[in-house]
Amino acid sequence: MDYKNKELCRLRTISFFLTLHKDKTQWEDALYSVKRDVDLLLPAVQKAGYTLQSIRVITNPFGEYLDLTNLQTAKADLQYLTELLNKFNESGIRIRFAIGAARNTEEIALLPELIAAYGDLCNACVNVPLDENGVLDNELIEQSVYAVQRIANITPRGEGNFNFTVNFNCKPFIPYFPAGYHLSHLPNSFVIGLETPDLLVEVLKSVPKSPHNQFYADCYQAMSQALQYHVDQVLEMLSAVKLSGKFEFAGIDSSAAPSKNCSSITKIYELMGLPYFGAAGSVEVSALLTKVFKSIQRVPLVGFSGLMLAVTEDLGLAEGTQKQYFDIRALLTYSAVCGIGLDTVPVAGNAKAESIAAIMRDTGTMAFRLNKPLTVRLFPIPNKVAGEISEFESDDLCNCRLLHIPD
């Protein structure tokens, strides 16, 4: 199939970054401004031959606009936002909502019950900084671990942790959930994220075998050229649309967002000569893929713009856990040269809080030391131990063998 075929590249998301204020009477107009631009963008996307999978709205920190007097007042505000989102959802495209970052331990403590109640309309993150000595804020980490464990225990099969992550060295304008957040001093903006595993797999099929260095150079060139073509097509589409002016275009996240419904990222490793993802050589391929995503020109690259290894969202990675092709240490190693950290990793329900906190600190230390955005999104599975298989029912998740966190 020709790499220019639009079926090989989908628009995973158009994500709108929006500031909300305490005055709830302004919320309807704010969300309507998103709808207005969606109504302008959707026909342009379709005319260009692409498929748009989701619209996402990402706000400033929820403590700046939700009434956090108590859990009930916060839920009431989220209920109102849910009603507004449902009111404006006329396109039939999936709408997802992120309430931004929790800024302190008190706000983190509210998240389990809010996520349990509102799920995919209540995605949230925590941004953990370094202190003056270059050490991660362990109080925020420990409260985040409590939230992860609480979410696991009060949502079916622990699936609520799909909507919560801990960020390290992550900047605004990540279009993906739940790591995306907005800051109120930044302009309202939108970002486009792509789903391209099918594209990358297809182009690699036609790269002829040659000696290692030449083969890897050819693989890089083929993937970079194909990805740049579709980015240029998206930019051409945007240039032809006259939007409302309420949102600035902030850029594209060039990551190959994974999905149950497209090629596995592991197929790329196999096409590049590895027996499986996790075998010796996986770091080298991961680094080359990251180079591909960073090669995109003529547009600001925002978000992760790197290799996403989301374990429970990728059928090949999920299968790899069951075959014991890799472990948590391997995922952390690959994060040194690529994207996202420990993302959607299922672990034992009885994993120690101290061990989860320690693996978060390891990931965060790597993020700041190597100056890259990394996240930790773990799924403790109640009543299961490492080595057992998850029993997820969510349409977004693949079942995996639970990985062990080294004590």
Where in this protein do the model-derived segments appear?
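Anaerobic metallocofactor- and corrinoid-dependent redox/one-carbon enzyme cores
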Residues: 1-407
